[in-house]
Amino acid sequence: MYGMMTGMSLATMRAIWMMVIFLVAQMFGKSYDMPTAMGIALFFMLLCNPVRILDAGMQLSYMAIAGVSLGNYGMKRLHKKTGFRRFQKRYPLRFRVVQSLFYSVTLQGMMLPVVAKTYYEIPVYAGLLNLIVVPGMTVVVAGSWFGLLVSIGTISLGRFAMLPVGWMLQGYTWLCERTLELPWNTLVTGEIRGWQIGMWYGGIACTLVLLRTKTRNKLRDFVYKHTGRFWRKREVVRYTVCTILISMLLQGAGQALCVWQQRTEAIYFLDVGQGDGILIRSPDGRNIVIDGGSTSQSKCGTYTLLPALRSQGMTEIDCWFVTHTDEDHISGLKELLLQGKLTQIKVRTVVFSAYVFQDAALAELEAVIRAAGITIVWMREGDVIGDDTFTLTCLHPTAEYRAKDKNAASLALAYHSNTFDMLFTGDMDADAVADMDIQQDYDCIKLPHHGSKYSYVEGVYAHADYGLISCGYNNRYGHPHTEVLQGLAQEGTQILRTDEMGAVIFRSR
């Protein structure tokens, strides 16, 4: 009933399967073994749908149970020692603290690669938060049931009974929010590979094997030789601090050992729907973004830009170029800036055209940028950003060009390196494209205005191997227009579309 009421997520399904196995074991007078129950639940869930193994929620759920099982195994081995049992009986509160820390380490150890693979980051203080939040959840659940039963008689009395639970949950929320404001609250890992995950779990497996061999006797003798020191408060604090440091080292190891990011030159045309979003990692390691917004995707910054930046380990953006201030080019940027430090993304400089169209949208965005303490740079035709390895050159608008609207005043940028030659055109109209008088060959030209026929100039794209169109699937504007697609085909330019292909990536070998 609970599973049906909550939508029967895969994590809930796993819990129900394991609960059923527990009840069956009790009925037949058998002992319940958590790893066995976990294996049976996994078998039947995958039997129904093998693709479930790729679901992040399912992976996290099973790794959490694996961490608990590993903690149970460790505690059972320790409990066989007389000194440890004596410590448990004499100092139950201290024992619970040490036990909680131990389980926190095993949980983080098992879940860390999956968390990094799914979210491209590792929460540093998660283990410490669990020490505070998890023990109190017993009170929350018990209080919730009590309030539910009381509310059967009268709703008003039920609300009163639920007040302590509400206060606790509000306190947990406040604590989590304050934690997000601490320095180094997350380690952005970038996209990790299968072999890195294999190395992490292989290391855990080797550690367990090591502890089951002759070496474990020497290790245990060393540990239990100092068991008596637990009687003194000073030593309890010392062991507690050591356990916390081990937890923190696990997080650091997750970034240093398991996490590896490609540092090669790459250009990413993101699938932001009806909008533009381009990430560039230059040969010298600079992180550059051009635009970043959408009118078809809600919260484009949170759900598209931020994961993309984190997946590539881009926590610091050296330059964020804004071609013009239409919402489908700036909504994601504004969203990230308004979230502030919560995103863990630092933008050093935002670049506008010196001849950007002046309107209310520009004034609003400029105010947000200045409030975030970010430098604003105004770029003119011929201005260059880069070094010996790459250059980004402003081609448009010129000082003489008179734009009739903000699209025509879009910033046009030419990217040149030893590997790629690309042209980014914002939402330029046909007159602006013709004004640039493009003669150079490019590997790829991003078509202006999402493939609009009103921005297409015949003959321009014959200079490019690829024509990139960033647009939303089945958008209301009909982008890209048929005339544009036919023109590109006649010019021999290969068409790349984010609405059909998703994100398009150019990466040097």
Predicted regions, residues:
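Hydrophobic alpha-helical transmembrane segments of integral membrane proteins
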Residues: 109-110, 131, 303
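Non-cytosolic membrane-interface motifs at loop->transmembrane helix junctions
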Residues: 123-134, 159, 188-190
